[in-house]
Amino acid sequence: MGKKSRVKTQKSGTGATASVSPKETLNLTSELLQKCSSPAPGPGKEWEEYVQIRSLVEKIRKKQKGLSVTFDGKREDYFPDLMKWASENGASVEGFEMVNFKEEGFGLRATRDIKAEELFLWVPRKLLMTVESAKNSVLGPLYSQDRILQAMGNITLAFHLLCERADPNSFWQPYIQTLPSEYDTPLYFEEDEVRDLQSTQAIHDVFSQYKNTARQYAYFYKVIQTHPHANKLPLKDAFTYEDYRWAVSSVMTRQNQIPTEDGSRVTLALIPLWDMCNHTNGLITTGYNLEDDRCECVALRDFRAGEQIYIFYGTRSNAEFVIHSGFFFDNNSHDRVKIKLGVSKSDRLYAMKAEVLARAGIPTSSVFALHYTDPPVSAQLLAFLRVFCMTEEELKEHLLGDNALDRIFTLGNSEYPVSWDNEVRLWTFLEDRASLLLKTYKTTIEEDKSFLRNHDLSVRATMAIKLRLGEKEILEKAVKSAAANREHYRKQMQAGAPLPRCEESGTAGARLPLALRDLEAEASVQEALSLTEAVGRAKAVENGLVNGENSIPNGTRSGKENFNQEGSERATEGTKESSSDSTAGARE
């Protein structure tokens, strides 16, 4: 999968001979599980909790040093075996080769001219590692008994990967040997590198991801040591935190949803070869062909011989890319920052505002997004702000007035203001809110730019600083845009300009409100690949496979959510989750 990290080459060796008492580790993991299962810390206490959890994890890592399974040689040494294995099992291997693109990591390079929309890559089901293949493997007996494995396909895939890696005769060895030895996701950050993310919106998701991963490891360490169905697992004598972090990171950056063989539902999968593709802006061009039972990818654009072949991972923000994929994508046209807004229940007009919002399909409290592109405000956010700033008379017009339903349908349309005064108030409010968010950062835009120019930073520190810089630039842009709109509408109001009115259609019931149309993935919610689309051949469809979809075993949901339910794992190409519960493609 494109842009997945390979910070260093694979270590030599076949595993470790070091010995550590299972009881000693069990005591440490029990302490870790207790710490990670405690209630969420209060405001301002998250960093303290993170440091405490990290301290326990580091103690465990120190005791387990040398116990992890590794492969001899470099990752790229195994590429010929991967291509041979893929070819022998029905995958396409003509027209491209695997190459190290330095900063972008390994990717695919065209060896011939490839036309836009040309089918150039397909991978049959038999090559995929899926939840179904996990059930039919040595992991099957434990899967049948463990509710967390049953509920969280992400974790099942991670253990499937670990078990197959430990088996030198595994069918998937040619694939597993080419996976990165480590990643650039925050799970691998040093403490100082995580500190660079403090005050960013992303930091809460970073803390949550680390805590969830530590809790899962502690829980499953005990399961593997004590559960009778775990006796035959090749992990029994050496299940390290390092191994688990690697496995969940591999899954996090690569997992996708595909239809099951009968097409009745979806399952999670790792897709060899295809997951080497790196990301660029564009459209999703991968899907699943049920007729031929294979994943198929068509070219995003024309690629000439010698050029890198890119795919589009989905509409992910850079926070999602950094947290779940381990890279920062410059000029990300889908970058955004979150802004949480809600109507206070103490508002005298709360009931009326809630009713208007309900008719528009918008909650009274939600996480919206401010965007990198123009306009920075979506139709849904604009509709919310208009209702939020309505007077009692304006609310009555939208509830009881003539053509009230038609008014609801135009709430998200910038061409039809509620009133000039309403526009002035909403843009003033947004300007103030974005300005306040900017003040929460400990550094300025200029300071971040200077720091990037004048310091020799690690890859991870650079990503962290670019991320906080990007957040501030989006907020600053929103402030300027809001200020310009405020002044524009103030002049309209002062001039007594006539208010534009939408042509009354009388057919409102047959239309969807503009605010409800799927104009964007608010709060980074990614669309799922529908079964209908999954059945079709690979085309440049909007909901296809995305490199590195993840609904999180190690994402950013609360501990309870992460342990007790399978976070809406979305269709292929980047199952990113709402409000950072996602995981995207990481650097190769």
Curated annotation (Swiss-Prot):
User: Record's Gene Ontology CC terms?
Assistant: cytoplasm; nucleus
PROSITE patterns recorded for this chain? SAM_MT85_SETD3, SET
Locations of Basic and acidic residues compositional bias?
Answer: 567-579
Can you supply a Gene Ontology BP term from the record?
Answer: regulation of uterine smooth muscle contraction
**SUPFAM superfamilies according to UniProt:** RuBisCo LSMT C-terminal, substrate-binding domain (SSF81822), SET domain (SSF82199)
* Residue ranges of the region described as Disordered: 1-25, 546-588
Please report the name of this protein according to its UniProt entry: Actin-histidine N-methyltransferase
Asked whether the keyword S-adenosyl-L-methionine is assigned, the reply is yes
Gene this chain is encoded by: SETD3
Domain SET: residue ranges: 94-314
Domain-level remarks: The SET domain specifically recognizes and binds actin, suggesting that it does not accommodate substrates diverging from actin.
Q: Which GO terms describe its molecular function?
A: actin binding; histone H3K36 methyltransferase activity; histone H3K4 methyltransferase activity; protein-L-histidine N-tele-methyltransferase activity; transcription coactivator activity
Q: Which reaction does it catalyse?
A: L-histidyl-[protein] + S-adenosyl-L-methionine = N(tele)-methyl-L-histidyl-[protein] + S-adenosyl-L-homocysteine + H(+)
Q: Where is the composition biased (Polar residues)?
A: 10-25, 548-566
Q: Which domain of life is it from?
A: Eukaryota
Matching entries from InterPro entries are given as: Rubisco_LSMT_subst-bd (IPR015353), Rubisco_LSMT_subst-bd_sf (IPR036464), SET_dom (IPR001214), SET_dom_sf (IPR046341), SETD3 (IPR025785), SETD3_SET (IPR044428), SETD3_SETD6_MTase (IPR050600)
Q: Does the keyword Phosphoprotein apply?
A: yes
Role noted for this protein = Protein-histidine N-methyltransferase that specifically mediates 3-methylhistidine (tele-methylhistidine) methylation of actin at 'His-73'. Histidine methylation of actin is required for smooth muscle contraction of the laboring uterus during delivery. Does not have protein-lysine N-methyltransferase activity and probably only catalyzes histidine methylation of actin.
